[in-house]
Amino acid sequence: MLKKIYNKVTHEWDTSVEEALKSFIRLPALSPDFDKKWEENGVLLKALEDAQAWAEKQGIKGLRCEIIKDDGFTPCLFVEVDATSDKKFERSVFFYGHLDKQPPNEGWDPDKSAWEPVIQNGRLYGRGAVDDGYAFYTSLAAVKALQTLGIPHPRCVGLFETCEESSSRHYESYLKEAEQKLGDIGLVIALDSCCGDYDRLWVTSSLRGMLGGTIEVRTLNVGVHSGEASGIVPESFMIVRRLLDRIEDSRTGEIIPRVFQTKISEEIHKQNVGVAESLGDRIFAAYPWHGKTEPLTKDACEALLNRSWRPELTVTGVDGMPSVENAGNVMRPYTTVKIGMRLPPDVDAEKASTALEEIITAEPPFNADVKYVPTVASNGWSAKAAAPWITKAF
């Protein structure tokens, strides 16, 4: 039966899902944080309308779709599929996904584009397809496969948002609004994470939290010639580096303050040892390394723990610096960097954000003007021990 399901889902992908995802890739459905005119241009709504239109053409029995749009909030798509009548299920399955995207950024291969789908070596490239436009389409394709093969399934519901890449700030309101429609949920499926390989099903047992914000350092009112100022005026980027050194050991990448860390249990360590043994060097081969760059650690288990249960800092943006092409001999008046810190799943993000601001702004070097503006603080998540029935199913 599993082979029949696989063949049916593969057929649905080849004949329907892939084309729907190609259309989705062509939509510049940027999340609100990256498109201030999202409501005016209507692209997020168009992404939901396309998804709804596709779903209603699939012939799924008992399907109902509804776009929910509250004033000033990004829209959501509510989906419901009745349980099959030949077997009674007490609780429902909940599907989660999102249809908003992050900006395309730079670095695309010459033969690929953010907004034009390309299939190469059996893989589909384009912005937003894997994060995570496919979630909606594959969830319903799975339900359709069960119905086509006569396999009973429980009632299925879903609430697909368009604000995930902007911290899902509207989603909780929609969940409360749809609480009666959603009913009693027995299983939540979110197709929005990573996998170790394409040979087996991977289940995410935890996700790190996140905090982020901007650090601004100002030393001058206007830029001045570096020949006149250097050696007297402290350089703003130098101060930024010193502030970041309060958080991260730049030699190792280790986060220094204990407030951002947690104790890793023996069970978590054991799980990661098992994954490391299964994947080996594929853990490192998954990344597009340049030249002879080496990983922070060559120990596969430690690398997995770094990625899942330890805090890590990333600088994601910078203002106050001209491009190299346009850079002259000027000492710039300020530097602003945007940072993101992944947090262990059980660390309180709000407390960590407050601590970060205190660490950054305390006793500014050279009494420079230092500001930290938090932009996000999201808690992580760690799954409870799986119920026996779902462990058996997997």
Q: Could you say what each language-model-derived stretch is?
A:
Residues 2-107, 334, 338, 351:
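N-terminal helical capping/dimerization or prosegment-like subdomains
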Residues 153-235:
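Histidine/acidic-residue-rich, glycine-tolerant segments that coordinate divalent metal ions
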Residues 201-205, 324-329:
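Short beta-strand/turn micro-motifs at beta-sheet edges
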Residues 341-344, 371-387:
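A short beta-alpha structural unit
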